[in-house]
Amino acid sequence: MSSSSELGNASSVPLQFLLFIDDRPNSQDSVQEIGQCLTNLLDGHSHDLQILQISKHPHLVEHFRLVATPSLIKLQPEPRQVLAGSNIIQQLQKWWPRWQQELAMDPNPEDTGQSPSCPREISSVGYSGELMKMSDELFLLKKDKEELLQQIQFKDQILAMLAHDLRSPLTAASIAVDTLELLQHKPIEEQKPALRSQLLYQARKQFKIMDRLIEDILQASKNLNSQFQVHGRPLAIADLCQEVLELYQAKFSKKNLTITYDIPKDLPNVFADEELIRQVIANLLDNAIKYTPAHGSITVGALHRTTQKVQVSITDNGPGIPNSKQETIFEGHFRLQRDEQTDGYGLGLSLCRKIIQAHYGQIWVDSRPKQGSSFHFTLPVYR
C-alpha cells in the first residue's frame, strides 16, 4: 500500500482511493483506522490511498459533490464510489466482496501489458480541480475589473457634479465682486452704501457655500479612506425606501402613525452602497417615529432634484428643532435639551452625515419649533 497527504501523480495500482478529512483533532484517528481496515481487507492487493484535507482542496470537494467528512472515494476499479460518514469501516466491509468481483473482471493492466485507461484518474481529477480554481479566480478578476470601471465612471461623474455645484456660487460671488469694483470707480456721491453692504454680504455668503462644498469633498475622501468601505452599485432608491418602510410597519401601528409614501415611479437609480444607505433611512425613520406624537404623520418622499442628484426626504410633525441647533445635531454625542433624559439623536445623525458625505452627497434638516422636521439627503444619479 502507498499513502500520501497530497494529490500527486497517479500510480497504476488496481485499487485507488482518495480520503477527504477535515481539520478536527480526531481526523487522524479516522485516517489510521480506515488505512488499517483497507490493509486488512485488501491483503495481497496493492492499492493507493491519498489523504486530502478539504480546507486545502475545496475545488475537489465541489468536484466530487462531497457533503460529509470523512469521505472515501474509490476511483479504481470503476465505477467510482463514495463512502462517507462515521461508519466508513462498516461500509468498506460491506462493499469489499463486490470490489473483489470487479477486480476479477478487470485484470491488472500491468499483467496484461495493456495501457491503463483509468489509473490516471487521480491526476485528471487534480487537473480538473486546478482548472476550476483558475476559473473561479478569473471570474473574481473580471468582477473586480467591472467594479473598478464603475468606480472610475462614478468618480468622473462626481467631478462633473462638483464642478457644476461650485460654478453657481463662484459665478454669483464673481458678479458681486465685479459690481463692487464698478462702484469703487464711481464718484463718492454715486456710491450706494446699502448696495455695497448687500454685495459684500452676497459675496461672503457665496464664498462660505464654496468653502462648505470643498470641506464636504475633503470629508468624503477622508471617510472613504478610513471608516467606510463604500461598495457602490446602481441602486433603486424607491425600492429600498419601500423595503425599509415595510420593516417598520409594527412601529407605525404601535403609535397609530399615518405614513405617506411620495416617491415617483420614474425616479432614476442612484450610485450608492445599499447597506449603508439602508442604515441612513432606518436611522432617520427611527428618529421620526421617536419624536412624532401618537396619531401623527410621517412622509417619505423623493425627487429628481437635478440631472445629477436625487433627494430623499423624511418628514414628521413632531416638536421640531430650533434653528440654532439644526447644524449641531449632526455632531457626535449632541443632545437637544428635550433629549437629556432620552437617547436623542446622538451618534445616529453623525453617522448618517459621514455615510452621505462618503457618497459625495449632502444631508440637512429643515425645521421649525412645534412644526415638525424634514430631514433631506442627496445621492448622485447613476449614469
From Swiss-Prot:
Residues 161-383 form the Histidine kinase domain. The modification Phosphohistidine is found at H164. It holds the Pfam family HisKA. The keyword Kinase applies. SMART domains: HATPase_c, HisKA, KaiB. GO terms for biological process: circadian regulation of translation; circadian rhythm. It catalyses: ATP + protein L-histidine = ADP + protein N-phospho-L-histidine. Its EC number is 2.7.13.3. It comes from the Bacteria. The keyword Phosphoprotein applies. Disruption phenotype: Deficiency in glucose utilization and/or glucose intolerance in the absence of light; no longer grows if less than 6/24 hours of light is furnished during mixotrophic (MT) growth on glucose, no heterotrophic growth (in complete darkness). Accumulates glycogen under MT growth, but seems unable to utilize it. No expression of phytochrome or its response regulator (cph1 and rcp1). It is an enzyme of class 2 (transferase). One of its GO terms (molecular function) is phosphorelay sensor kinase activity. Induction: Expressed at the same levels in light and dark (at protein level). CDD domains: HATPase (cd00075), HisKA (cd00082), KaiB_like (cd02978). Keywords: ATP-binding, Biological rhythms, Kinase, Nucleotide-binding, Phosphoprotein, Transferase, Two-component regulatory system. Member of the two-component regulatory system SasA/RpaA involved in genome-wide circadian gene expression. One of several clock output pathways. Participates in the Kai clock protein complex, the main circadian regulator in cyanobacteria, via its interaction with KaiC. KaiC enhances the autophosphorylation activity of SasA, which then transfers its phosphate group to RpaA to activate it. In addition to its output function, recruits fold-shifted KaiB (KaiB(fs)) to KaiC to cooperatively form the KaiB(6):KaiC(6) complex (independent of SasA kinase activity). The N-terminus interacts with KaiC, while the C-terminal histidine kinase domain autophosphorylates and is probably responsible for self-oligomerization. The N-terminal domain stimulates the C-terminus to autophosphorylate. Homooligomerizes. Interacts with KaiC1. Interacts with KaiC1 and RpaA. Binds to the B-loop in the CI domain of KaiC; SasA and KaiB compete to bind to the CI domain. HAMAP family: Kinase_SasA. This is Adaptive-response sensory kinase SasA. It comes from Synechocystis sp. (strain ATCC 27184 / PCC 6803 / Kazusa).
